[in-house]
């Protein structure tokens, strides 16, 4: 009979005793300078078992183990198992009441502890597990001094507590066969008697079962490492070498922490297992590229399925693609991917993961309701129709074509908004940690015809002043923007008969109040006397935001309002009061009372604030203290380089540029900064952007790495080590990313656009100097002809000449002016850099597939929906196909002669430069004969249109309407606009051959076909 067969039938402790008999002199445990053989360990186990045995321990009796991590703790667990009991290891850092409550719930009689902790557990019978008791028997090792209770594979060896989502943690009953299944799965980990396994987990953590018992079951050595060593990457690295450790199991968070400081920390190990959270592909890539262990294992498994359920041997090829599968099940473990009806789903389809086999725990001790929910018996999954016991993991996964399983998300309450998967439970956790609320529920709201949004209903604490604004600021420091909920304070939350928050009742009330508010807004908009402005505005906010109980001092934006919803506010205010407010007025007076006072004042703010010019000029000097240590940059196209750092890769231009980059043989690798919480999410967002524009072909995507970060955060939100490593890796920087919003003020663009550019400058000047190529906008010069009468704008002109009319422009353009000035200031110091100023970027010249959120697309599509178009004479919109820009960027940046220059990426010939009137005529030829009206009449028709709230021009309306100079709007200031000089651009592209740089009739036809295919405009064929 094999060892494994014997252990499978006899149980976990029998396996340990096998090695006591066969390898007594092998090392069993190492704790600092103290080392103990299996013979010596058994002596101490017998010592303690002899004392504990006097208490007549019943089979599977729960024995509390409150002993610090160390040799004494290992002895305690082994002694309990020797007598047939169940180990209940607990964390001594827990509060006394929590520990005592949990032990009491298990009807615990005996607690093993140490002298210093004994007083904490006075209500239980305590037995001390100190070093003293080892001296009771100094007569050496005696085999089977204390007869072992033979228990078998179904013996409950441990009770571990999970951190339950509600109330008291759930006690999980772990069985012997679940642990031995792990110990003898040689495909995942194969320990030899000469191996040394690190024990770094708290004994109450399920990973400790792997560290202690798979090691002892295989006759290997446990090496205990204290917490202060584990959390110090340098100390951990030194200890791994000092103690010749061969295997370690680390959480994802710890792995990320260690690798960020020492990429090759695990190079001497045979096995590194990691799990507990979604793995970060970029971290795995760093490990595999910088001295990897022999095997890097991505492990997955809930406590209820004995720590490791599935495993995957990670490869460099996979992580470069952003993939970190959780792999395949261990031996004697079965996995099922099922739909809501518990039927298997097809390969590639997302379903919930269910687990069967020896891995599955007995259940939650004394929790029948929880067991009924999580541990199921079904017969249709077995071949012979016999019952199969499975555990419901609550995790959404899919089967890949390789046969490996990929983790997708948690199933509980998950919602997807604007491409991001959001777990309301995570938001609830953040709210509760704020100490500002005593209760909360976070719900996704789906309203017909409207975008899904998140509302957080919070019960404020009564022991102090409460402010939604403070709570909002607290969340913004901890959650990414896409997870920010709309906040609503409530006095209480309804409960079910089981005492849980009644989410259905909360949602029903919310939907009723929102619907009622919408009806009141509809009625009051057509009635002159609709009550005071505060009451009316509160009703309007309830309708627009989808929340109620709005405080007078609540900020529209802190409640979750977006610029699109702010535009809807302005429409309703104009229809109700005949008052055309500006978007800036909402940002200046965002509270209910503040905006109501603006309405009551009865006039719109149209005066340009020239004092803001000082802010722009001051910000343009932010890089003044950044030195350029070398004016030489590497040739990024050379065979030894080819490493590109790219921002904006999920934007329209960025996706096309990324596609061009990776198709070039001289580009070896591209690292893309993507706003996301982790690398896995960043990779998915990046691939989603490529798919959105039909660019998601598989070729060469292995060159691409997505880095989770944020342009506007210091050092992109990376650690100093990560930022420095990125700087050393990079050959060239292409800064294409930007926040683009035509109605938000400068302050809303400042972080991403200005500080994002500053971060790129820091990256370019950290370590070796790298060339920095910045994509600005042709609009950065503003309506120069209106103010100066100029007829041509030179490419290398000093932007300072245009600062006088900067206050008249929109916040986006102001931020680009500041950002470009930062680049020019660094060029003056010798930084190798190029500035590009593209015009309005349209779809590609082959397919016409473009960004329908951009200005000109909104104008065209919105006007077609309206049936009217504005008369705007002599307005060139310098429209260019996106593929012209990507080609020009790559060609121009390939020549160092172009460093320090600026290039206008606009139509290169007068024939290709299509003005707005010509565009309307081309649309007419394509079947869209729009009625031409004066600009102000067009605005009036648009603002009164019954379908305005669904017109793509709605978010643009404030900036289209607002008069900024002598009753002229910003768009009108661009009449008779100067032409853009293209001398630099034409010279640099002369050897590239003929490039299409404008939008003609056939180009527009392809755009229209794309709009029709997307359902944005009706067909005119």
Curated annotation (Swiss-Prot):
Pathway: Secondary metabolite biosynthesis. The keyword Ribosomal protein does not apply. Keywords: Ligase, Multifunctional enzyme, Oxidoreductase, Phosphopantetheine, Phosphoprotein. Residues 528-603 form the Carrier domain. One of its GO terms (biological process) is biosynthetic process. Residues 17-418 are annotated as: Adenylation (A) domain. Residues 646-888 are annotated as: short-chain dehydrogenase/reductase (R) domain. CDD domains: A_NRPS, SDR_e1. The keyword Oxidoreductase applies. This is Nonribosomal peptide synthetase asaC.
């Amino acid at each position: 009979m094999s060892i494994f067969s014997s252990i499978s039938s006899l149980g976990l402790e029998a396996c340990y005793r096998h090695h006591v008999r066969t390898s007594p002199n092998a090392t069993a445990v190492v704790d600092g300078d103290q080392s103990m053989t299996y013979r010596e360990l058994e002596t101490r186990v017998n010592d303690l078992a002899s004392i504990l045995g006097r208490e007549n321990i019943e089979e599977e009796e729960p024995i509390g183990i409150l002993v610090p991590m160390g040799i004494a703790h290992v002895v305690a667990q082994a002694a309990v198992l020797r007598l047939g009991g169940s180990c209940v290891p607990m964390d001594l850092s827990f509060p006394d009441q929590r520990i005592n409550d949990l032990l009491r719930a298990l009807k615990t009689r005996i607690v093993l502890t140490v002298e210093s902790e004994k007083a904490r557990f006075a209500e239980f019978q305590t037995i001390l597990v100190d070093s003293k008791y080892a001296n009771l028997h100094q007569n050496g090792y005696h085999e089977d001094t204390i007869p072992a209770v033979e228990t078998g594979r179904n013996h409950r060896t441990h009770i571990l507590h999970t951190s339950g989502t509600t109330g008291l943690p759930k006690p999980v009953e772990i069985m012997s066969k679940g642990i031995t299944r792990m110990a003898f799965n040689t495909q995942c980990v194969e320990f030899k008697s000469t191996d040394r396994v690190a024990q770094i987990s708290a004994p109450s953590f399920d990973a400790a079962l792997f560290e202690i018992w798979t090691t002892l079951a295989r006759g290997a050595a446990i090496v205990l490492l204290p917490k202060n060593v584990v959390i110090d990457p340098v100390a951990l690295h030194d200890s791994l070498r000092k103690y010749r450790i061969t295997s370690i199991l680390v959480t994802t968070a710890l792995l990320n922490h260690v690798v960020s400081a020492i990429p090759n920390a695990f190079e001497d190990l045979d096995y590194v297992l990691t799990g507990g959270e979604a793995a970060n592909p970029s971290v795995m890539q760093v490990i595999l590229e910088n001295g990897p262990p022999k095997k890097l294992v991505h492990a997955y498994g809930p406590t209820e399925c004995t720590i490791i359920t599935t495993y995957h041997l990670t490869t460099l090829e996979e992580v470069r693609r952003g993939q970190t599968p959780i792999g395949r099940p261990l031996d004697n473990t079965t996995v099922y991917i099922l739909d809501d009806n518990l039927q298997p789903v097809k390969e590639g389809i997302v379903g919930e993961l269910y687990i069967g086999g020896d891995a599955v725990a007995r259940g939650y001790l004394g929790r029948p309701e929880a067991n009924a929910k999580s541990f199921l018996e079904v017969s249709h999954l077995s071949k012979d129709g016999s019952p199969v016991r499975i555990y419901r993991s609550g995790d959404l996964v899919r089967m890949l074509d390789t046969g490996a399983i990929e983790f997708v998300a948690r199933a509980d309450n998950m919602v997807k908004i604007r491409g991001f998967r959001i777990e309301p439970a995570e938001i609830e956790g953040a709210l509760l940690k704020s100490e500002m609320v005593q209760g909360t529920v976070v719900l996704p709201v789906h309203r017909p015809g409207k975008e899904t949004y998140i509302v957080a209903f919070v019960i404020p604490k009564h022991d102090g002043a409460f402010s939604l604004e403070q709570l909002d600021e607290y969340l913004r420091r901890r959650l990414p923007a896409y997870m920010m909920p709309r906040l609503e304070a409530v006095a209480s939350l309804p409960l079910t008969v089981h005492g849980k928050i009644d989410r259905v009742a909360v949602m029903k009330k919310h939907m009723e109040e929102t619907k009622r508010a919408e009806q009141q807004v509809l009625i009051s908009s057509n009635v002159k006397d609709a009550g005071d402005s505060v009451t009316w505005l509160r009703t309007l906010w309830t309708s627009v935001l989808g929340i109620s109980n709005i405080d007078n001092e609540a900020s529209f934006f802190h409640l979750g309002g977006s610029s699109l919803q702010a535009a809807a506010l302005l429409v309703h205010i104009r229809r109700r009061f005949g008052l055309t407010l500006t978007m800036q007025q909402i940002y200046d007076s965002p509270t209910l009372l503040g905006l109501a006072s603006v309405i009551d004042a009865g006039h719109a703010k149209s005066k340009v604030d020239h004092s803001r010019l000082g802010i722009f000029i001051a910000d343009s000097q932010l890089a003044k203290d950044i030195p350029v240590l070398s004016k030489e940059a590497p040739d990024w196209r050379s065979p030894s380089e080819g490493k590109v750092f790219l921002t904006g890769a999920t934007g329209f231009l960025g996706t096309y540029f990324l596609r061009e980059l990776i198709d070039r043989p001289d580009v070896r690798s591209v690292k893309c900064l993507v706003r996301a919480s982790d690398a896995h999410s960043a990779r998915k967002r990046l691939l989603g952007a490529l798919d959105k524009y039909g660019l998601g072909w598989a070729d060469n995507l292995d060159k691409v790495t997505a880095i989770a970060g944020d342009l506007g955060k210091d050092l992109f939100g990376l650690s100093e080590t990560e930022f420095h490593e990125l700087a050393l890796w990079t050959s060239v920087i292409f800064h294409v990313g930007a926040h683009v919003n035509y109605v938000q003020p400068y302050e809303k663009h400042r972080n991403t656009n200005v500080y994002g550019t500053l971060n790129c400058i820091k990256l370019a000047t950290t370590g070796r100097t790298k060339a920095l190529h910045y994509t600005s906008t042709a609009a950065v010069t503003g309506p120069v002809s209106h103010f100066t009468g100029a007829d041509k704008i030179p490419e290398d002109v000093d932007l300072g000449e245009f600062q006088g009319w900067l206050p008249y422009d929109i916040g986006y353009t102001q931020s680009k002016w500041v950002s470009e000035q930062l680049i020019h200031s660094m060029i003056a110091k010798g930084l190798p850099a190029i500035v590009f100023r593209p015009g309005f970027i349209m779809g590609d010249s082959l397919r016409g597939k473009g960004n329908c959120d951009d200005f000109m697309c909104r104008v065209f599509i919105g006007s077609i929906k309206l049936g009217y178009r504005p008369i705007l004479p002599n307005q060139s919109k310098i429209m260019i196909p996106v593929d012209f820009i990507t080609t020009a960027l790559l060609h121009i940046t390939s020549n160092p002669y172009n460093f320090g220059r600026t290039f206008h990426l606009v139509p290169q010939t007068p024939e290709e430069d299509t003005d707005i009137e010509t565009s309307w005529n081309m649309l007419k030829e394509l079947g869209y004969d729009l009625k031409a009206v004066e600009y102000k009449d067009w605005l009036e028709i648009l603002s009164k249109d019954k379908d305005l709230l669904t017109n793509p021009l709605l978010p643009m309306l404030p900036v289209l309407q607002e008069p900024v100079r002598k009753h002229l709007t910003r768009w009108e200031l661009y009449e008779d606009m100067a032409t853009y000089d293209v001398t630099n651009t034409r010279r640099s592209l002369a050897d590239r051959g003929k490039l299409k740089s404008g939008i003609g009739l056939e180009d527009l036809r392809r755009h229209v076909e794309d709009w029709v295919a997307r359902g944005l405009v009706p067909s005119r064929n």
